[in-house]
C-alpha cells in the first residue's frame, strides 16, 4: 500500500463522494492520505482471516500512479501479471473492479465476475447502471469461481494441459528420431 505502488489511493480528494474504500494490507503512509472520511484502513490480515471477515462489495484491482489508468511500472505490470489479489478477492466472494487492459480482464469479462474500466473516473457511471439483480448475479458467479479455486480446479486444469502439451511434444520429437 506504499505511496510509490499505489499513488492513486492517496488522491482520495478526487474520490466520488458516494464511495467508501475499505483497505487491507501493509505499508500505508497514512499521513499522505487526503479525505480520510472516505477511507477505512484495516491493516494487514492473513489471507484466511481476511476471507472470513472482509467488509465490502467489490475488490479493486488497480495499481500505479493515477486514477486515469494503471500507469507507472506497477500499473503497467498489470498488463502481464496475474495478481494474487484477484484470487484473494474471489475467495472473499467479492466481484472485481479491474483495469480494462489488465491481463486478467478478459477472464473477468468471460466469467462475468466483475467490472472492467479504463479509468477509475468511469466507475460512477458503471455502478449507476448496475442493478441489484446484476450485482447478485455477478456475486453468484464469483462464489462459483471461488468454489473452484478452493479445490484447486484451475491449477489442476493448467497442469493437465501442460502434461498433454509436453506429452504431445515428446511423441512428435520421438517420431523425428
Locate predicted features.
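A structural micro-motif
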Residues: 19, 37-39, 68, 94, ...
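Short amphipathic alpha-helix with an adjacent loop that forms part of the alpha/beta core around
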Residues: 49-53, 124-131
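N-terminal pre-catalytic "stem/leader" segment of glycosyltransferase-like enzymes
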Residues: 101-104, 172-177
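A short acidic/histidine/glycine-rich donor-binding loop in glycosyltransferase catalytic cores
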Residues: 111-117
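A charged, aromatic-enriched C-terminal amphipathic alpha-helix characteristic of glycosyltransferases
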Residues: 118-121, 125, 132-174
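Conserved catalytic-core segment of nucleotide-activated headgroup transferases in glycan assembly
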Residues: 1-52
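Anion (oxyanion) recognition and catalysis
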Residues: 15-16, 90, 109
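Nucleotide-sugar-dependent
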Residues: 54-87, 91-92, 98-106
